[in-house]
Design a protein with these regions (language model features):
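Rhodanese-like catalytic fold shared by cysteine-dependent sulfurtransferases
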Residues: 1-41, 49-91, 102-150
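Short, surface-exposed ligand- or partner-binding patches at beta-edge/loop junctions that are enriched
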Residues: 94-95
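Conserved G/P- and acidic residue-centered "switch" motifs that form tight phosphate/ATP-binding loops
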Residues: 45, 99
């Protein structure tokens, strides 16, 4: 088992290597372990309500849409909703479908004063495989981490 300190150092090194504006980037397994080990850590799932309902949810995650369904319009209340549900001092892990929206959400959170933000690489479903299908290459579900059907 890797210690919390080791995981956060690895995530921070990725952030430096990739020139990310937030604290770090974690694989789904690493993120799940950080969530388990870090007191008060919060996992914020920024997918849409449709994705939570039709694709699946992570039990215990805070759910705040980064973009709204249908139309994928930016959620103008994202930061206000984040402030209502997550303390600015908390370690915050951002998760989306494949790691793109969560990257934007983590960046926005840092700009809003959240100093301990991490992106979950690969997201909930991971990237598409050679046949254009998700959940076969990377992602929270593919890693066998806790989730439930919406």
């Amino acid at each position: 088992m890797t210690s919390l300190s080791d995981l956060l150092q690895l995530a921070a090194q990725r952030a430096r290597d990739l020139n990310l504006p937030y604290q770090g980037a974690l694989t789904p397994r690493e993120a799940a372990e950080v969530w388990r080990l870090a007191p008060g850590a919060r996992l914020v799932d920024v997918r849409t309500r449709a994705e939570w309902d039709w694709v699946g949810r992570v039990p215990g995650a805070v759910e705040i849409e980064w973009q709204t369904w249908p139309g994928m319009q930016p959620n103008p209340n994202f930061i206000a909703q984040l402030r209502q549900q997550v303390d600015a001092e908390a370690l915050v892990l951002f998760l989306c479908r494949s790691g793109v929206r969560s990257k934007a959400a983590a960046s926005a959170a840092v700009q809003a004063g959240y100093a301990n933000c991490y992106n979950v690489l690969e997201g909930f479903e991971g990237d598409k495989d050679a046949n254009g299908q998700r959940n076969r290459v990377g992602g929270w579900r593919h890693a066998g981490l806790p989730w439930q059907q919406g």
